[in-house]
């Protein structure tokens, strides 16, 4: 019986890469408007090159790009980029369809809810609260809570302990097969791959279930628990 569902956050509950691309695009426009002499497409590519190398959560991304490409960090250019980024990010941070419907249905069925994210603690909570999801989740585990990223067993162990369930009583939902699915399966959890959020052109997720929509989780719980709980 599934007693708890654990969700990844980015590209599982929220459309993170849509937000990231829009925010970087706006930041590039703002820096160029402030006097940075570089084609926009080239600047965006340089930003993402460093993101992919050093981490998509890098909080000093614009400093690094400016220092690497121009030999100095102009505070006016930097400020313009940060402000442009923040304004765009807040404007396009959105949930995938049916997320609230799904979470409400799970809670109605008596299923505990948690989040495991590789992002820093404050960044995770800013997203959760901004999206008004903080009332749904009993516990949230971030990178700062264990110092380990998925597929390490530590984040999964922590969330299972906090939720008070065994691995076989939990379902992990995530978009990144190599982290979310592999890590959870090694722990003995059931797994559901959020295909709708896949950014890696994954061919075989290895998950027990594949989701085309978040509300597919409700059908999984009904199947696993043997009764229609989530209506």
Question: Where do the PLM segments sit?
Answer:
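Asp-based, Mg2+/Mn2+-dependent phosphohydrolase catalytic module
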Residues: 1-5, 17-18, 68, 100, ...
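N-terminal helical cap/lid subdomain that shapes the substrate entry/recognition surface
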Residues: 2-101, 122
């Amino acid at each position: 019986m599934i007693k708890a569902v654990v969700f990844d956050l980015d590209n599982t509950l929220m459309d993170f890469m849509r937000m990231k691309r829009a925010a970087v695009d706006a930041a590039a426009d703002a820096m160029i408007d402030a006097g940075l002499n570089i084609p926009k497409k080239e600047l965006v590519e340089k930003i993402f090159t460093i993101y992919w190398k050093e981490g998509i959560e890098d909080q000093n991304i614009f400093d690094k790009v400016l220092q690497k490409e121009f030999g100095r960090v102009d505070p006016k250019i930097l400020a313009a980029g940060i402000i442009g980024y923040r304004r765009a990010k807040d404007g396009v941070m959105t949930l995938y369809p049916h997320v609230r419907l799904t979470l409400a249905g799970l809670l109605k069925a008596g299923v505990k809810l948690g989040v495991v994210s590789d992002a820093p603690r404050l960044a995770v909570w800013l997203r959760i609260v901004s999206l008004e999801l903080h009332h749904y989740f009993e516990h949230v585990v971030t990178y700062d809570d264990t110092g380990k990223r998925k597929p390490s067993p530590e984040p999964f162990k922590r969330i299972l302990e906090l939720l008070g369930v065994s691995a076989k009583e939990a379902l992990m939902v995530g978009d990144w097969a190599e982290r979310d699915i592999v890590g959870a399966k090694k722990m003995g959890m059931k797994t559901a791959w959020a295909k709708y959020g896949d950014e890696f052109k994954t061919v075989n997720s290895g998950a027990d279930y594949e989701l085309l929509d978040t509300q597919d989780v409700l059908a999984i719980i009904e199947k696993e628990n043997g009764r229609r709980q989530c209506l």
